[in-house]
Amino acid sequence: MAREIHKIASLRRESSLWRRGDDGVYFSRSSTGASSSRFRDEEDDEEALRWAALERLPTRDRVRRGILLQAAEGNGEKVEVDVGRMGARESRALIARLIRAADDDHALFLLKLKDRMDRVGIDYPTIEVRFEKLEVEAEVHVGNRGLPTLLNSIINTVQAIGNALHISPTRKQPMTVLHDVSGIIKPRRMTLLLGPPGSGKTTLLLALAGKLEDNLKVSGKVTYNGHGMDEFVPQRTAAYISQHDLHIGEMTVRETLAFSARCQGVGSRYDMLTELSRREKAENIKPDQDIDVYMKASAIGGQESSVVTEYILKILGLDICADTVVGNDMLRGVSGGQRKRVTTGEMLVGPARALFMDEISTGLDSSTTYQIVNSIGQTIRILGGTAVISLLQPAPETYNLFDDIILLSDGQIVYQGAREHVLEFFELMGFRCPQRKGVADFLQEVTSKKDQEQYWYRNDIPYSFVPVKQFADAFRSFHVGQSIQNELSEPFDRSRSHPASLATSKFGVSWMALLKANIDRELLLMKRNSFVYIFKAANLTLTAFLVMTTFLRTKMRHDTTYGTIYMGALYFALDTIMFNGFAELGMTVMKLPVFFKQRDLLFFPAWTYTIPSWILQIPVTFFEVGVYVFTTYYVVGFDPNVSRFFKQYLLLVALNQMSSSLFRFIAGIGRDMVVSQTFGPLSLLAFTALGGFILARPDVKKWWIWGYWISPLSYAQNAISTNEFLGRSWNKSFPGQNDTVGISILKSRGIFTEAKWYWIGFGALIGYTLLFNLLYTVALSFLKPLGDSYPSVPEDALKEKRANQTGEILDSCEEKKSRKKEQSQSVNQKHWNNTAESSQIRQGILPFAQLSLSFNDIKYSVDMPEAMTAQGVTEERLLLLKGVSGSFRPGVLTALMGVSGAGKTTLMDVLAGRKTGGYIEGDITISGYPKKQETFARISGYCEQNDIHSPHVTVYESLVFSAWMRLPSEVDSETRKMFIEEVMELVELTSLRGALVGLPGVNGLSTEQRKRLTVAVELVANPSIIFMDEPTSGLDARAAAIVMRTVRKTVDTGRTVVCTIHQPSIDIFEAFDELFLMKRGGEEIYVGPLGQNSSKLIEYFEGIEGISKIKDGYNPATWMLEVTSTTQEEMLGIDFSEIYKRSELYQRNKELIQDLSTPTPGSTDLHFPTQYSRSFFTQCIACLWKHKLSYWRNPSYTAVRLLFTIIIALLFGTMFWDLGRKTKKEQDLFNAVGSMYAAVLYIGIQNSGCVQPVVVVERTVFYRERAAGMYSGFPYAFGQVAIELPYILVQTLVYGVLVYSMIGFEWTVAKFIWYLFFMYFTLLYFTFFGMMAVGLTPNESIAAIISPAIYNAWNLFSGYLIPRPKIPVWWRWYCWICPVAWTLYGLVASQFGNIQTKLDGKDQTVAQFITEYYGFHHDLLWLVAVVHVVFTVMFAFLFSFAIMKFNFQRR
C-alpha cells in the first residue's frame, strides 16, 4: 500500500526515491535483458493486439488487468481478466500451471519473479536484523511456592495487591532468560536456531519480532536496517510464527489462510508493481503472462480469495486438505502435522519480509519438513527475505539447507555464524561430532552437563565440564565471533534501507476492509455453528410451550388475585430472554485465544472484531424472541392490544441484546471458562435481585437503592409491567377507588404507573447494550490473555541456570552425586546397546512375564464416510488396514513407521485394544494364546501421543497414582516407592518430582517433560508389552535421546516394546532392532531387522530394481521413506507391498508368526483372579486421593467459587437486611421467599456451570486411565463426587452463617440446622447435576446448551413465580419431580411454617398463609429432607452410570 511506506508522488516520473540503493541506486536499468524480451515477430497477431490494448490503459487500470489462460492444461482460450475478481478456481488453475510440483518447480517460479524485476532494475526490499547486548529478565516463583494451591492463590492475591500499593515487595525471584546476546541476522540467508529446552529460543524470537511481554525487564536494542523498534511497526514488518497452534476449528484450511491474507494486506507489492508496470511499458517489455497475472493478483489487497493463499497451500502441501476444517479438541479436522503447517501458512500469506519461526516441524515427518524448509529457503535466497527458524530434530539434509547457525544455551549465544565453521569452533573447544551423529543433534547436546563428556576427544587433556559461559566467552574470541563484533561496531548505513522494507502503518488494509473481513468470518462461523442457534430456538419453543400450558388464559382472571401470577409470567419472560444470552459467554471465551493471537499480530483492531459479533446477532435476536413472544402472548392472556404486543416484543429484543452484550463483556474480562462461568451467574443474580421483582422497590434498603437504578432488569421490569397493566384488560376500577386494577397491582409491587416508563425502560436497555459492547471492545483492546509465560521453576534448576550464566561450578556433595549419575547416563550408542548395564528396572524386586505378541491378517474397517458416499463410492465400509501380519518379541525394540495416513496409529490402537468403533478381523495372540482385552490391559502399557494427564497434580503424584493402581496388591508400599524412584531416575524426572503437570501449551511441564512423564506413567506399571505412539514427536534432539535411552533400557530388561516414530535422527533410528514399515493404505512393505548401520534395510530396498542408492552419511530413515513413496511407486510401476509378499523375508516372518501363535509346552494362558490389580475399595480411596490433590491445586475453580459465594452472601445479606424478622405483611413474606428463591437458583446454577469444565478435563484423563486397566468407572465417579462434599460444606457454612444472621431469620437450633441442611443438599444436587450433564453429553459445549433448558423448567415450577396450588392440574405433577420446588418447600416451611402470628389486616396466621398460598406444610419437613437426599443421590448415580457406560472418545 502507498500509505504503508511512502506515497509515490508520481509513478510516471523517474523518482530518485525508487532508484537509490547500496551504491546510490535501488533500481538500476538493465540493458541486457530488454532486447530478449521485446515482442517477437512470430507472436500471434490477436494476442499482440490484446496486449497492446491492455498497454494503452492508464497504469492504475493496467495493474488490475491481465491475460489469463482459461484452462490449466495450457490449451484453453486466453482472455483478459480483472485480477481483483479472480475466483478461487482461477487462482488454483494459475498456481497449478506455475508450480506443477512444489519440489521441482518452486525455485523456477521464484526465479521468474526475480528475473522480471531484474530486467527493469528493481530490487526486492531486504531487512538486516541486529541485536546488541540484549538482556531479558523474568520474575518467577521458585519451588513449591509456585504451585497454584488454594492457599498459595490467596497469598499471591494478597501480595499482588500489596505490591501494587507498594506496601510489600514481591516474593518472586529474578530469572535471566537471555543474557548479553548480540548478533546479526543477514538477509538472503537461512538461520537455524538451536538450543536445549529452556535455553531462551522462544524469548529470542519474540524479542527479534518485537513481541516481548510488557512485564519482562528488557535491556539492549534490536534494530531493523538500523531503525529502532519505535520507528516502524515490527508486528507487520516481521512475522512471528508460534509453536502453539491456535485456530478456529470450524474454518477450513483455505478459509483460515484466506482470512489471514485478507487482513495482512499486500504490503508494498502494489507500489512496486505499479513502478514495474510503468518501466516495462517504457522499455516495451512484455512479461510472461502467467507471471504477470500472478504478480498483479498478489498485489491487490482485501480479496476474499487470494492467489497468494493458493500458492502457500501448494508449497506447504496443504492443497490436499484445503477444504477440510482445521478442527480442535471437540471437532475432528486435519492431522496435527497439517495443523502445524496451517500455523506456518497463516503468516506466510502476509507481506512480512522477516520470518521468525518457532518449532514449525513438530508432528511432521522428515521429508515434509525438508520440503517446507527448502521452499522457504528458496524464497529467502531468491527474493531477499530474512529468516530465523527454530527446529527440534532437524535431519542432516534439513540442517544442510541452512546458511547460518545460532546455538543458544541457558540464555547465552554459544555460536552464531556460518554453518561451515560450527564444528571447527567446537573442535577448538575439545569436542568432536561422531561420524554417524547428526550435527544438529550434537550441537543440542554438547553444552549439556549430562551429555557433554561423550564428545570430548582430547586424550592429552582430562575432561572437565565446560559451562555455557566458557563457550560464550571463547566464541567472542573465535574468528566468526570477532567478525560479528567488528560488524556490530559499525552502525548500519540507514541510507541503504529500501523504502519498502519497513512497515509504518499499523494495519495492512483499511479499517472498513478489516470490518468487512470480520463480518464475513462471523457469518461463516454462525453458519457452521448453526446447531447452537437451532438448539436455542428449540429451547425457547419448549419453554414457550411450558409457559402457554402453565399460565393458560382460560384459567386466569384479570383481577388482583391473579395479577401476581401475570406478574410472575412477565418476570419469567424477562428471566428466560435474559438467560438466553448466556450461551454467548461460552462461545466468546472459546474464540478468545485466537482473537488475542490475531490482535497481537495486528491483523485488525478489536472494534472490527466486536462490532460484527454484536450487529450480526440482532437478526438472530429478532427471530429467537419472536419464537417466544409470538407463541405465548395471546395464549397466556396478556392485553390483546396489537401495539402492546409489539411493544413487548421490541422490549424483549432489547433485553436479549443487552444480555448478550453483558455476557460477551464478562467473557472479555474473564478470559477463562471457569472464571467467566462463575461471574456470569453473579452478574445475572445481582441484576435480578435488584430488578424489583424479588425485592420490591419500596423494600430496597437505602444503601442499595443505587443498585436498583443501575440494574438493567429494573428498567425492563418497569417497562414490561407498565406496558401490560396499563392496558385495557386491567382498566377496571375498584368501587370507591380511583385506581384501576392494573395500577393497584403495579403499586403493590413498587412499579411506576406512568406510561412513559416503557420508553424509559426501552431506552435504558438500548443504552446498556451500547455500554456493554463498548466495555467489551475496551476489554479486548487492552487486556492480555490469562496465563504466566514463565511459571514456577525448581530451586535446583534456577541455581544451575545461574551457575551456567556466570561460569560458576557448583561444588557440593549433591553435585558430586548427580555428576556420577549423569556420567553414567550419557547418551551413547554404545550405552544404548549395552544390555548388561541397562537392566536398571529391578527385575528382582518386581518380576514380570516375558511375553510376545503376534498378529495375522489384521483388517480394520469403518463405515464409509458420508462425504465419500456422496462422491459415488458404493462400498459400505472403508478398509484402513488390509491384512497386516507381524510379531513383536521380548528384548526386541521395533519401530513402526510409514508416511502420514499409512495406518501406524490405527494398527497400534487395534493391537492394544484401544479402538472404540469400527470392525476388526484377524488373529492376535499373546505368547501363543488368543488375546483377551481384560487380561491384556493388566500386562500392557500404552504411551499415547497426546500426553494426557491430570493437570493439577505433580509429576511424583502422577507416578504414585499409576503405580498404586496398576502394580499387584502383593507389592508393598516401600517397594512401590523404590520402584517409582528408580523409574524417575531412569527417565530423568527426579529434578521435576514436585513440578505441576499443568495443561499442554498453557502451564506446567514443557512438551518434552510431559512426554517423559507419559513414558514413566506406563513404566511404573511394570508392563510386559509397551506400545508407544510417537514418543519423540515434539521433542528436541536431546530430549528425544533421553526418551529413547529410556525405551532402550526398558527393552533390554526383556520387555516387548513397539514405537511409532515420525522423523528419527540416524542414531535414534539405529537404536531400534527391527522395523515394521507401512505404506499409505494400511499395508506392510518391510518387516525385519535393521542390521548394523541399517545395512539389512538398505540391502533389501537397494535390491529392488530402479531404487536409487543411499548417499554416504544420509539418514536411512529419510532415504527409506523417500524411495518408498507413492510417487516412486507410480514412477517405477511397482507395488512395494506385493514385492514384500513375494520376498523370502515375508516367508520367514510368516513362519515366525506361526511359531509364536503356538503356546510353548508347559506354558499357561494369562489369568488374573480379578479384573483390576486393586480391590474396589482401594480404587475408590486412590481416586479420592487424586481428586483431593486436583481440587486443592485448582483455585480458579475452588477459590473463585468460594469468592462468588462470599460476594453473594454479602450482597443478599445487605439487600435483605433484617427482612427475616418481618412477617406482618404478605409482601414481607414474598421478599423473604424471594431471597431464598434467588439464592437457590443462581448459586445452584453457578455451581452446576463452573464444575463442568473441571469434569471435562478430568474425563479425558479418565478415558486413558480406564483403558489402561487402572480402575473401573465407579471409583472414579466416587472420587469426583466425594471430593465435592467438604468443599460444598464449607461453601454452605460460609453462605449460611452470613446470610442467616444478616437477613435475621429466627435463631433456633432447629431452624438454623434445617436451613443449612437444605442449602447443603441443594448445592450438592446442582453440582452433581452439572457433572451428570457432562457425563451424558460428548463435550462441555453441548452440556452448557442443554443445561439451561432444565434450569428454565426448574425455575418455572419452583413455586415462586406461580405457587403450586395455582399451577394447572396437568402440570402439577412436575412440581413433585422439580428439585428446586422441594428446596423452596423446605426453606420456606422450616422458617415460616410454624409461625402462628397473624398477618396485618387479615384473620390468617403466617403458617396458614404459607400453607394456603404456597401449599407448604411444616409437618412434612422430614419428607422434604428425604427427597433432597434422593435427588442428590440420583444425580450422583446418573453421573456415575454415564461415566461407566458411555465413552464419547472416538478412536
Curated annotation (Swiss-Prot):
Domain ABC transmembrane type-2: from-to ranges: 513-725, 1178-1392
Stretch list, region Disordered: 809-835
Binding site for ATP 1: G195, P196, P197, G198, S199, G200, K201, T202
UniProt GO cellular component terms: membrane
Database matches in PROSITE patterns: ABC_TRANSPORTER_2
SMART domains: AAA
UniProt KW Membrane keyword: yes
Domain of life: Eukaryota
Record keywords, A-Z: ATP-binding, Membrane, Nucleotide-binding, Repeat, Transmembrane, Transmembrane helix, Transport
Record-level Gene Ontology MF annotations: ABC-type transporter activity; ATP binding; ATP hydrolysis activity
Compartment(s): Membrane
Binding site for ATP 2: G898, V899, S900, G901, A902, G903, K904, T905
Transmembrane parts of this sequence: 531-551, 563-583, 618-638, 650-670, 674-694, 760-780, 1197-1217, 1237-1257, 1285-1305, 1312-1332, 1342-1362, 1373-1393, 1423-1443
Pfam family for this entry, one: PDR_assoc
Domain ABC transporter stretches: 162-435, 853-1105
Compositionally biased tracts (Basic and acidic residues): 813-823
Membrane protein topology class: Multi-pass membrane protein
InterPro entries from the UniProt entry: AAA+_ATPase, ABC2_TM, ABC_transporter-like_ATP-bd, ABCG_PDR_1, ABCG_PDR_2, P-loop_NTPase, PDR_assoc
Family indicated by similarity: Belongs to the ABC transporter superfamily. ABCG family. PDR (TC 3.A.1.205) subfamily.
Purpose: May be a general defense protein.
Protein name (database record): ABC transporter G family member 32
Gene name as annotated: ABCG32
